[in-house]
Amino acid sequence: MPSCAYCCSCGPKMPALQLLFLACLVWGMGARTAQFRKANDRSGRCQYTFTVASPSESSCPREDQAMSAIQDLQRDSSIQHADLESTKARVRSLESLLHQMTSGGVTGTQEVQEGLQGQLGALRRERDQLETQTRDLEVAYNNLLRDKSALEEEKRQLEQENKDLARRLEGSSQEVARLRRGQCPSTHHPSQDMLPGSREVSQWNLDTLAFQELKSELTEVPASQILKNQSGHPRSKEGDKGCGVLMWVGEPVTLRTAETITGKYGVWMRDPKPTHPYTQETTWRIDTVGTGIRQVFEYSQISQFEQGYPSKVHVLPQALESTGAVVYSGSLYFQGAESRTVLRYELNTETVKAEKEIPGAGYHGQFPYAWGGYTDIDLAVDESGLWVIYSTEETRGAIVLSKLNPENLELESTWETNIRKQSVANAFVICGILYTVSSYSSVHATINFAYDTNTGISKTLTIPFKNRYKYSSMVDYNPLERKLFAWDNFNMVTYDIKLSEM
C-alpha cells in the first residue's frame, strides 16, 4: 500500500520506524474487509479514503429500488464520516511525530516511541469500531432488502386476489341479472300499515336471499303435474268434506328441495281458511336452522313457489322457535324464541295482534319431540280450528292438547293424554283426533297413536308413514287440501290421506 511504502522509506533501522512498519502490516491485514487509502488529489492536497465492499451485491442498486434504505444508510454514513475525520486528525498527529523524528535524529526517541504506540493503539480501536459499524450497516441493509422483497411479493398476491374477486363479482352480477330477467313479477305489494322499517328490511332480504332461492330444485314429481284444479292445488271432492278417522297415508310427493344449509329443517304451509289479499295458492316457508329466526318467505302463486321466487319476505318483530308455526285465517301463529309464549302475527298488516303464555308448558328443550330441535310447543290446525300440542311438569312429559281461540289465543279446552311427547317424532290433529308419528328417520315409520278428544280415549295404530329422506322435522295437516304437509331433510313434501266415516 502507498502508506506503507512511505513509512518504510524513512529508515528501517530506527526502532520507531520498525514499530510504524508493524502498524502498517496490521493495517494491511484489516484491509480484507475494509480499505484505508491515502493519496494526493489533482490540487496536490493529501486525501484519505475508507472503502467497504458489499458482501452480497455485485453492483449497486438503482435509486428507485431502495431509496428508503439508502436514505437511512446516508444518515449512518454521516456519523461515520465524523469518526473518519477524527481518525484523520490522529494520522496527521502521527505524521507530525514522524517528521520530528526525521528532522531531529534520535533525540527524544523514547518519547516518540511512546507517542507512536499510543497513537497506534488509538488507530486500532478506531478501526475496530469502524469495522463493527460497517458490519452492522451491512446487516441492516440486507434486512431492508429482504423486507422490500417480502412486501413486493405480498403486494403481488393482494393484486391477484383483487383481480380474482373482481372477476367473481362480475360473474355473479351477470348471473343475477340473467336470473332476474326471467323472474316472475310480484303480484302482492306490502301493506301501507306495515311496521316502520320492515319494508326496507324485507326488500333487502329479498335481494340477498332470492339468489339462494333460485338455486332450489324440484325433485321426484313436478308440482305442476299434481295441481289438477283451477286454483292450482288438489282439493277434496265435493262429497268428501265430512270428518273421519285416519285410515291410510300415501307416498310422499316432493314439491321443492332447499339447497342451503338453513333448509335442513323448517316449516311450510298454506292457509286452510285464506282471507284477502291471500288465496288458496299463497304459500309461506320458514327455514329454522340457527338462532334469531325472523324471516318468513311468502309466495303469492304456485309458480313462484315452484321456481323459488318469493313475492315478499316478512321480518317478524320477534324471533320464533323451531318448526311448530302454522298459518290460519290470515295470521301466522308461532312460539316466541326461548319462551312459552304463542304469538299471532297478522300477515297483511305485519303486526302482532295477540300473544299469550301457555300455562306450565315446557319450552326450549324441556319436552321436545324425539328429534329435538326445541319442538316443545307445536301448533296445529284442523277442520274445527287452532290447536296447541305441548307438555308440562305436572303431566311428567305426557302430551297435553289444548284448543285455542284464534283471535286472542285464550285456551278454550285442554286434554291430558297418556302419550309421552319425547317418545314420538311428531304430531298433528285431524277432526279433533291427535295422531303421532313413531320415528322421524325410519323409512318405515308408522302413525302409532291416536287420541280422540271427543271420547278422551287413546289407542295404538300401525298406519305406514314413509320418511323418504330420513329426517322429518315437521308434519302438519291442511284441512282444506286434505293432505299432510311435511319437511323431510331439506325437502318439502305432501302426503295424500284417506279418512273413514266417523
UniProtKB/Swiss-Prot annotation:
Gene Ontology molecular function, alphabetical: fibronectin binding; frizzled binding; metal ion binding; myosin light chain binding; receptor tyrosine kinase binding
One Gene Ontology term, aspect cellular component: myelin sheath abaxonal region
Subcellular location: Secreted; Golgi apparatus; Cytoplasmic vesicle; Secreted, Extracellular space
Region (Disordered) residue spans: 166-198
Chain positions carrying an annotated carbohydrate: 229
UniProt keyword Signal present: yes
This protein's record includes keyword Ribonucleoprotein: no
Tissues with expression: Highly expressed in skeletal muscle and retina. Also detected at lower levels in thyroid gland but not in other endocrine glands such as the adrenal or pituitary glands.
Location (main, coarse): secreted
Site positions for Cleavage: 225-226
Signal peptide: 1-31
Olfactomedin-like domain residues: 242-501
GO biological processes: bone development; cellular response to nerve growth factor stimulus; clustering of voltage-gated sodium channels; ERBB2-ERBB3 signaling pathway; myelination in peripheral nervous system; negative regulation of cell-matrix adhesion; negative regulation of Rho protein signal transduction; negative regulation of stress fiber assembly
Origin: domain of life: Eukaryota
Modification(s) after translation: Palmitoylated. Undergoes a calcium-dependent proteolytic cleavage at Gln-225 by CAPN2 in the endoplasmic reticulum. The result is the production of two fragments, one of 35 kDa containing the C-terminal olfactomedin-like domain, and another of 20 kDa containing the N-terminal leucine zipper-like domain.
Binding site for Ca(2+): 378, 426-427, 475-476
Induction (record text): Up-regulated by dexamethasone.
InterPro entries in the record: Olfac-like_dom (IPR003112), Olfactomedin-like_domain (IPR050605)
Coiled coil: 82-183
Purpose of the protein: Secreted glycoprotein regulating the activation of different signaling pathways in adjacent cells to control different processes including cell adhesion, cell-matrix adhesion, cytoskeleton organization and cell migration. Promotes substrate adhesion, spreading and formation of focal contacts. Negatively regulates cell-matrix adhesion and stress fiber assembly through Rho protein signal transduction. Modulates the organization of actin cytoskeleton by stimulating the formation of stress fibers through interactions with components of Wnt signaling pathways.
Name by which UniProt lists this protein: Myocilin
Organism, scientific name: Rattus norvegicus
Classification of source organism: Eukaryota, Metazoa, Chordata, Craniata, Vertebrata
Primary gene name: Myoc
